[in-house]
């Protein structure tokens, strides 16, 4: 079997049916599907009971990393493809993964091409296109390209996943970024440029909206790099910090624009020297200005609210 598709889920009754329907529509047949329920309390399990072709595993709520690890420990495919239970694949997705693996002589790590959407009708604009790939000796070699490899984009050799130790079981987010960095030196990284293979759903309960947990996960990336937990030593340090700060920069800005000022400033301070080393002057100068502007705006809005109450 070429692929094991592993789907962690937690209270996704609203979306998981569309996810599974997109799997059933695949034009490539050599795969198994494992869904790991992470302690759902809504109707997710009821929906899963209607899909006998899916292998369902259950655990107490431990987070998506632990759920993916459980699925990976029970799978039999040569490659593992992760899919989140609120996202969808296109009919050609697994076929595209298989072709990329074939033409590149079985690379260790392949990354999907995603399309962000809010409403499923937006997916109608996505069409199958000829295969185009960007090839690198390893993931660290992409550090100047800005390629992000989230869990739902990962297709990797099962043996490589096992050797890495899998996702952290800590109850934090950015566990996928941590794994990608630990996989930084595996043999050959392939980024799919076309066709689009993943429909990444945007909604109010997206993990990316949980700022405290993302903050803890982002701090883990910084601390892990400082502690030498990522491979490559001093020779690959600049590449690693480019990849770490690829995550810290946008998140620090998002923090200060959503009133998590302490989070944003802490990330700015902790990565300041790294940004100097990689010559990120626009960020080093721009972040304080953005933080100041939003701080003034919040203060002004608060004053206006007080004045309105006094009228």
Task: Indicate where each model-derived feature is located.
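Short aromatic/hydrophobic "clamp" motif used to bind/position activated sugar donors
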Residues: 80
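Conserved nucleotide-sugar donor-binding catalytic segment
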Residues: 112, 130-217
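Short, well-formed alpha-helical segments that are part of the catalytic scaffolds
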Residues: 12-25
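A conserved acidic beta->alpha catalytic loop
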Residues: 22, 29, 37-46, 62, ...
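Acidic helix N-cap motif at the loop->helix transition within catalytic regions
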Residues: 14-17, 40-50, 88, 92
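C-terminal subregions of glycosyltransferases and related glycan-biosynthesis enzymes
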Residues: 202-311
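Glycine-rich, basic loop-to-helix element that forms the pyrophosphate-binding segment
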Residues: 59-75, 96, 140
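Conserved donor NDP-sugar-binding/catalytic core segment of glycosyltransferases
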Residues: 92-125
């Amino acid at each position: 079997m070429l692929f094991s598709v592993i789907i962690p889920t937690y209270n996704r009754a609203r979306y998981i049916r569309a996810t599974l329907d997109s799997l059933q529509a695949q034009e490539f047949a050599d795969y198994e599907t494992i869904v790991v329920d992470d302690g759902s309390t809504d109707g997710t399990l009821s929906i899963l009971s209607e899909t006998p072709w899916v292998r369902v595993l259950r655990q107490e709520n431990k987070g998506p990393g632990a759920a993916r690890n459980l699925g990976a420990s029970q799978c039999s495919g040569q490659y593992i493809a992760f899919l989140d239970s609120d996202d969808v694949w296109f009919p050609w997705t697994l076929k595209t993964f298989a072709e990329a693996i074939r033409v590149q002589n079985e690379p260790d790590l392949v990354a999907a091409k995603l399309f962000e959407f809010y409403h499923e009708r937006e997916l109608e604009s996505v069409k199958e296109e000829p295969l185009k790939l960007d090839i690198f000796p390893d993931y660290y070699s992409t550090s100047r390209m800005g390629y992000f490899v989230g869990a739902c984009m990962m297709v990797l050799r099962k043996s490589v996943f096992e050797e890495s130790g899998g996702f952290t079981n800590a109850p934090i987010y950015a566990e996928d970024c941590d794994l990608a960095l630990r996989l930084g030196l595996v043999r050959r990284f392939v980024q799919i440029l076309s066709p689009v293979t993943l429909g990444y759903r945007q909604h109010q309960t997206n993990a990316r909206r949980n700022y405290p947990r993302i903050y803890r996960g982002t701090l883990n990336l910084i601390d892990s790099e400082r502690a030498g937990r990522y491979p490559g030593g001093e020779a690959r340090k600049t590449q690693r910090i480019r990849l770490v700060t690829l995550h810290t920069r946008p998140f620090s800005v998002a923090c200060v624009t959503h009133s998590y000022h302490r989070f944003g400033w802490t990330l700015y301070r902790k990565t300041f020297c790294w940004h100097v080393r990689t010559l990120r002057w626009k960020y080093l100068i721009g972040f304080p200005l953005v933080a100041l502007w939003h701080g003034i705006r919040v203060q002004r809005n608060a004053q206006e609210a007080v004045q309105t109450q006094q009228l």
